[in-house]
Amino acid sequence: MLEQMGIAAKQASYKLAQLSSREKNRVLEKIADELEAQSEIILNANAQDVADARANGLSEAMLDRLALTPARLKGIADDVRQVCNLADPVGQVIDGGVLDSGLRLERRRVPLGVIGVIYEARPNVTVDVASLCLKTGNAVILRGGKETCRTNAATVAVIQDALKSCGLPAGAVQAIDNPDRALVSEMLRMDKYIDMLIPRGGAGLHKLCREQSTIPVITGGIGVCHIYVDESVEIAEALKVIVNAKTQRPSTCNTVETLLVNKNIADSFLPALSKQMAESGVTLHADAAALAQLQAGPAKVVAVKAEEYDDEFLSLDLNVKIVSDLDDAIAHIREHGTQHSDAILTRDMRNAQRFVNEVDSSAVYVNASTRFTDGGQFGLGAEVAVSTQKLHARGPMGLEALTTYKWIGIGDYTIRA
């Protein structure tokens, strides 16, 4: 089965690579329209997936990731339309010039070819990834989690109908609908057909892909994100940022998981934090230095376990640790962070600059929420993933991250001397 999918995707990629920006945008507009026109089919399929997942004991955080609503589905369709409005990087000349030999040389952006994406209970990923791949002239093979099998099947069917109505092969966007995990291992060895693999899931999936894949892998999306509260912070303003970073949508990878508080501001900051977190329904996991003071406040508090500093809660839980200074905060982030998104809240711009320079994450913020690490927020449109590695792509992966380049030399029957 996968062999035939690979062949179909590779053949489709050749056709997609030749499309003009106008032709690709026409396809995307058709997909967005069909997602709305056939929303009832997709939402009914999703309702069945959610019901099964709840019956199987899936956590509330994961159920939130899985669930589609009419508003969310409309937002997904609107994201596709936003991709239409983005500049097409394919065909862009990055640089070039004329050599001493007279050869005119240029470096031009081209599609990667076929992208493979493995993801879990995130039905929006199906459309986000498909739209970005189509905009950049790439075919895609999707493997969603078993929790989203009906939703993904319905969504991909809509996309394939739109492709065919525009005269393009259905092989441009395909999904593996068999939940057999053995197919993941088979997919990881499809280097004959797949040019880049992107896993979007937990640490176990990333480890599996790194160890078994014969395809170049882009890893990321695991977000143990930190906010350091410096001693010069404006407490009321800082609390607004922390509430946003923790509670806006707790199940996302750019949600803050650990709060590092400078010891010199702890006495005034912790009571205010407790009040705010109680109002927001957040459970605080406090270290020994913060525990007694937080227990005197209204928020629910438990003693932090050492391993929780490495956890991506994806829920209304927040670690709180008292640190001696900026050096201590940076050391903690280096030990426990996942190089996703980290922030400092401070009025001291020297400390802010040090934090930016010394914290080696894909996104670093000064006096801003970690929730901004998102393709849409960055103006990239929908994102295919958030990469926390350094080669090829880093941070939210938009259109350019789905391209490579080729060297083109144009001569006049020019030969090398």
UniProtKB/Swiss-Prot annotation:
A GO molecular function held by the record: NADP binding
Pfam families linked: Aldedh
Catalysed transformations (reactions): L-glutamate 5-semialdehyde + phosphate + NADP(+) = L-glutamyl 5-phosphate + NADPH + H(+)
Keywords (A to Z) from UniProt: Amino-acid biosynthesis, Cytoplasm, NADP, Oxidoreductase, Proline biosynthesis
UniProt pH dependence: Optimum pH is 7.0.
Regulation: Inhibited by p-chloromercuribenzoate, copper and nickel ions.
GO biological process: L-proline biosynthetic process; proline biosynthetic process
Enzyme class: oxidoreductase
Quaternary state and interactors: Homodimer. May form a complex with glutamate 5-kinase (proB).
Record-stated family: Belongs to the gamma-glutamyl phosphate reductase family.
Official protein name in the record: Gamma-glutamyl phosphate reductase
Organism: Escherichia coli (strain K12)
Gene field: proA
